[in-house]
Amino acid sequence: MTAKLDRTAIAPKNPLLNASRRSNLPHVPGIRVGDYLFLSGMAPVDPQTGERSHGPIAEQVRITLSNMQHMLESAGSSLARVVRIHVVLADIAQMAEMDRVYREFFPVDPPARTVWSMQLRFGNGCEIECVALAGADDGQRA
């Protein structure tokens, strides 16, 4: 007997942040499975215009993590509930600058993290995805 996978697509309240609405890609911004939220890789998209930022890496990381925060809050969770994060940088030499901004969003007790470097689509300097616990922030990840 195969167990049914109960998953629900989640989307940001701001439609400008939903890449699947702007393209014909087979993409959802995130899904909820049980007590977990899985957010797809997010790019530095300006929430006011829907345009990609190609500014300094600090700006791109800040926009991307702010969008991730918005997405988690749209799903009833928060950055404090993130248990795993994956950062891709187009240029690994920018890791120190990325870390500086990252610490603004995760100042204490950061989640598990992996950082890779590779060429990214559309000239993006970063792409970030995460896994978080669903539900309101109770100060706990467990």
Can you say where each PLM-predicted feature lies in the sequence?
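N-terminal presequence-like segments and the immediate start of the first folded domain
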Residues: 1-66, 70-80, 89-142
